[in-house]
Amino acid sequence: MRKTLAFSLLLWWGQSAFGLSLDQYPQASRFIERMASRYRFDPASLRSLFAEAQIKPSIIEVMSRPAEAKPWYEYRKIFLTERRIQEGVRFWQRYRDLLKQAERVYGVPPEIIVAILGVETLYGANTGSFRVLDALSTLAFAYPRRAEYFARELEQFLLLTREERLDPRNPQGSYAGAMGWPQFMPSSFRQYAADFDGDGKRDIWKNPADVIGSVANYFAQSGWQSRHPVATRLPRRAESLANTDLNPKFTLAELKRLGVPLAPYPDTLTANVIKLDGENSPEIWLGFHNFYVITRYNRSLLYAMAVHQLAETIKSRLEEMQHAQKN
């Protein structure tokens, strides 16, 4: 029995993909019934659509791997690369007017928008090669551990394709169903994607205006505070206050009373003390409310710090180039 089961699993994993059978996946049939009753989708059309969907064992394999936790000094090297910095400068130069417009409308500075796109997809170069329909169907119907979440995202995907008049067979994205240059999940697309150029479509796959406007809108709706700081380095003696909370838990007035030396920021600002693994010794940082807002995009302190440092590096590099051109 065990040998037969093991052989069957080997055969299953060895397949690159196979069709989604409604007989094999009754949860898919229940999903179709729910979409029909709740959102008035045509059941026959959905059955036809899912007959073309493919279950991808490679996606299950990737999702099932244990997450590898890297220390900050290794994580940083992935994103703070010369290529990512140079291409970020070029992206900023190429779309300067759109970035300025997004800052006027949403209050989000260009460097944050540029850094998000740099970290997520290398400015649109690596947006994923899976059909979103296949990725979300695989995870909704063949990955029980997170089936509920991905079924909701599949629901949102079908709704957005109907709203945007897209063929659900066409959009491509990551193995988890994240889409476009900013890697929005379908629920995020429906809430935050912006038609920034007013052409009647929200295109985060090919339209730089919509990409930039959508990222800016995401941050604005998540509570970005215009012209407020993101993070600043602290001396090691503040280490005892460090914690892993994402939400800011101190006012600056409280931190000053606790002996944390701070630049002249308003006492009412909120922040948190963060400890990261440096290569030789811990790095202690103060993450303000805007640092927390970055974690709304990806709930990781390391991710938020990578975005912040990439943003500051790109901005500094661009300013150096502009200064050199004037002299």
Regions found by a protein language model. Give the residues of each.
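An acidic, Gly/Ser/Thr/Pro-rich helix-cap/linker signature
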Residues: 20-94, 100-103
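Flexible, glycine-rich surface segments
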Residues: 168-279
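Solvent-exposed loop/turn segments at secondary-structure junctions
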Residues: 54, 120-124, 178, 237-238, ...
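A contiguous strand-loop segment
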Residues: 27, 34-52, 147, 151-172, ...
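Acidic/His-rich structured neighborhood in mature extracellular/periplasmic domains
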Residues: 75-214, 220
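Positively charged n-region of N-terminal signal peptides that target proteins for export
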Residues: 1-4
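C-terminal functional modules
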Residues: 271, 276-327
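N-terminal signal peptide c-region/cleavage motif recognized by signal peptidases
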Residues: 13-16
